[in-house]
């Protein structure tokens, strides 16, 4: 009888989130000159109303490790900030309830700090791939990555805003992946679930609704080639199953 009981306890331990250390979440958000101010305000609203409240609900049963990092024209070397909630096993319930509120306030304050710094530096371009590469290097374990950006990589690697790319052709997308491998190296997204929200069709003829399905295919293929999985893609974080 002892063997089945031991196996059951081991199974239980492995499935209790707080016994496996913090759950890792990373939020990468387009800031500085990578997105207009009103768009950044929209991302902040998404964080305040659609993302952070859902993450905060986990705090009473799970230790959460949240990394916030900007997507800019120099995403790979951009500073990141880490917030970690208390271990629920060793923290009184009333303190965990307080931690839920503190966590959300600190995350928004951190967003504002990162935005201020990114605006001051104002590096042109939108390096989503560089941000994903940095996120992969920060990851300590299986985790979840939320990208808040319009979806258009604009860097030395490529300009997805260019409708002449013919991105709907698989061979074109594969050629871009080969360029990423050669110049930067693919991100290491093994065991990472990625969700991209904030997607837009753009404001002019270069970025129209016909282009966006091809851009989704590109990101899906890049993330898969990097060992990760694209689990959500759309205009709002509500498409992300891990929230």
What residue ranges belong to the model's regions?
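Well-ordered, non-membrane alpha-helical segments in soluble/globular domains
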Residues: 40-53, 125-133, 165-181, 209-219
């Amino acid at each position: 009888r002892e063997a089945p009981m031991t196996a059951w306890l081991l199974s239980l331990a492995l499935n209790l989130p707080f016994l496996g250390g913090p759950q890792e979440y990373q939020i990468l958000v387009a800031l500085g000159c990578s997105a207009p101010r009103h768009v950044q305000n929209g991302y902040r609203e998404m964080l305040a109303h659609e993302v952070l409240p859902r993450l905060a609900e986990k705090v009473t049963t799970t230790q959460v490790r949240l990394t916030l990092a900007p997507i800019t024209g120099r995403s790979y070397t951009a500073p990141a900030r880490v917030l970690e909630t208390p271990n629920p096993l060793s923290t009184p319930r009333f303190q965990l309830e307080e931690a839920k509120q503190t966590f959300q306030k600190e995350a928004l304050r951190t967003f504002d700090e990162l935005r201020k710094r990114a605006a001051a530096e104002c590096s042109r371009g939108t390096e989503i791939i560089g941000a994903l590469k940095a996120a992969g290097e920060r990851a300590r374990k299986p985790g979840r990555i939320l990208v808040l950006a319009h979806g258009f990589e604009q860097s030395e690697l490529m300009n997805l805003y260019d409708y002449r790319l013919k991105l709907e052709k698989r061979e074109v997308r594969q050629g871009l992946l080969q360029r990423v491998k050669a110049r930067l190296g693919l991100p290491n997204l093994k065991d990472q679930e990625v969700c991209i929200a904030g997607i837009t069709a753009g404001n002019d003829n270069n970025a129209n609704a016909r282009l966006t399905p091809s851009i989704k295919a590109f990101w899906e293929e890049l993330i898969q080639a990097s060992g990760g999985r694209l689990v959500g893609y759309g205009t709002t974080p509500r498409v992300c199953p891990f929230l």
